[in-house]
């Protein structure tokens, strides 16, 4: 019986609260709606770039603390003629943030410092935008959620002051940002370009970093060219620290500057970029492009990519993986530079690499392949001054090689090189003469013999460093010591060089 009375009392109390809330809604909502309309109109008038701002009606829900504007139209003075419209714009804010908008309540609800939630969500439906003779587009839906900011910046904005941009960004938090079905047409000097974006997604913007960014079904087209990407994604993006970011933004690489001034700016920027790229936490953890394509004005101008991916997990210790799958380029891309590739319409690249720290050195393994040319596999251990690449030529030249092994399987590369000689029928003697000239001395006898086997019947060429002792990079290419430093062996292929040439270019 006692529990039944408790349940009954709770039910009655809940009903009363609901009735009170409904009563408050009926009284307060019209007041808030009128006030919001006045504030929005007043704000639009204060912003010099806005010429006109209007909406058909305003709705306020005190229970959800959401404000909804219908049929929004904004016309800008600058850029001239820019128009934006939305069928519906809804803004939902936390109770504290809503109270901060009331000057008499602000001292009691707005803290002196620290992070505070300023917006639960903002959603916009049926967005369109245009500039006469330049731009026209639409966006089906956009939403932003979980926005937080430093209380100092909230106070500054409410007082009409503009916070310093980097400081504002450093303390801002956005849980999510989504956009669906963006379409735009841009007028150019030679015609028009159409762009579409199926979806955009951002997750976890905080501490000058972004946890996830996705662009899906991104396409662009003109009257003669088309390009598209099924997916562009980035995880774990980290911008430079606030101090470095301010310095980078202060440097303006203006095309009107003199070459001397530009060189000075670049010299100022490069060390900061090196510091950003070589920090313990990489600037981006994952970068990926999937299903990219390009089609030019001519039928042969076709390029495509199935996958390109970078996994940059750490700089200290070094850990990185890269992959390229089916990068296809037209053969005419290299033929236009004088290289003749009979019977070949496309160049198809594939490759993978795995780089990681191993006993204080960097171990790199992987392969590169070009269809109908050959495949190279490698496994090398090396060290660089400082232990981390700083993307400088001096550091690259100062690196030392410990152990290294390379294996190349010929699938037509040598035959194509021979076919591009002045007299292809004399390619064999020419190769032998070039080997005798390039690798003289008795120390290179075994190396020359192996290379001559390979050029006579292209098959597999294996090159292995004979010692694991650290060797300066430049010394690895010293002709006088190549034969002692590298062991070269060749496995003959099934066809001779001339048989390959006849198969690749039978009409020669």
Question: At which residue positions do the language-model features occur?
Answer:
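Short, Lys/Arg-rich N-terminal segment immediately upstream of the first membrane anchor
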Residues: 1-5
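Glycine-rich, small/hydroxylated-residue low-complexity segments
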Residues: 6-11, 23-508
């Amino acid at each position: 019986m006692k529990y039944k009375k408790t349940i009954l009392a709770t039910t009655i109390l809940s009903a009363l609260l609901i009735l009170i809330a409904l009563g408050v809604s009926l009284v307060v909502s019209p007041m808030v709606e009128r006030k919001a309309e006045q504030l929005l109109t007043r704000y639009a008038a204060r912003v010099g770039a806005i010429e006109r701002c209007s909406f058909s009606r305003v709705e306020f829900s005190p229970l959800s603390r959401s404000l909804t504007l219908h049929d929004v139209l904004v016309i800008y003075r600058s850029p001239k003629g820019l128009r934006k419209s939305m069928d519906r714009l809804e803004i939902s804010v936390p109770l504290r943030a809503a109270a901060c908008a009331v000057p008499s309540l602000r001292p009691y609800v707005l803290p002196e410092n620290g992070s505070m939630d300023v917006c639960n969500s903002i959603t916009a439906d049926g967005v369109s935008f245009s500039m006469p003779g330049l731009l026209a587009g639409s966006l089906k839906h956009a939403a932003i959620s979980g926005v937080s900011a430093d209380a100092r910046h909230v106070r500054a904005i409410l007082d009409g002051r503009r916070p310093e941009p980097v400081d504002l960004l450093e303390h801002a938090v956005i849980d999510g940002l989504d956009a669906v079905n963006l379409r735009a047409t841009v007028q150019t000097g030679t015609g028009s370009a159409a762009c579409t974006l199926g979806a955009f997604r951002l997750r976890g913007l905080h501490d000058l970093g972004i946890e996830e960014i996705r662009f899906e079904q991104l396409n662009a087209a003109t009257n003669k060219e088309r390009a598209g990407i099924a997916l562009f994604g980035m995880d774990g993006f980290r911008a430079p620290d606030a101090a470095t970011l301010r310095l980078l933004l202060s440097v303006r690489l203006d095309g009107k500057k003199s070459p001397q001034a530009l060189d000075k700016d670049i010299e100022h920027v490069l060390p900061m970029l090196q510091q950003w790229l070589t920090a313990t936490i990489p600037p981006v953890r994952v970068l990926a492009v999937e299903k990219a394509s390009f089609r030019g004005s001519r039928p042969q101008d076709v390029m495509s990519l199935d996958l390109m991916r970078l996994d940059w997990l750490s700089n200290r210790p070094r850990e990185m993986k890269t992959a390229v799958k089916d990068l296809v380029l037209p053969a005419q891309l290299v033929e236009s530079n004088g290289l003749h590739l009979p019977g070949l319409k496309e160049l198809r690249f594939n490759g993978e690499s795995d780089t990681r720290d191993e006993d204080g050195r960097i171990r790199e393994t992987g392969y590169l392949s070009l269809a109908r040319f050959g495949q190279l596999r490698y496994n090398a251990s090396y060290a660089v001054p400082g232990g981390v690449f700083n993307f400088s030529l001096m550091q690259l030249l100062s690196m030392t090689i410990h152990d290294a092994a390379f294996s190349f399987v010929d699938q037509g590369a040598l035959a194509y090189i021979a076919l591009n000689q002045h007299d292809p029928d004399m390619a064999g003697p020419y190769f032998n003469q070039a080997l005798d000239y390039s690798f003289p001395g008795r120390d290179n006898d075994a190396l020359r013999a192996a290379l001559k086997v390979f050029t006579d019947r292209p098959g597999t060429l294996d090159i292995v460093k004979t010692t694991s002792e650290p060797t300066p990079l430049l010394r690895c290419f010293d002709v006088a010591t190549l034969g002692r430093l590298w062991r070269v062996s060749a496995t003959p292929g099934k066809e001779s060089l001339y048989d390959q040439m006849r198969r690749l270019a039978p009409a020669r």
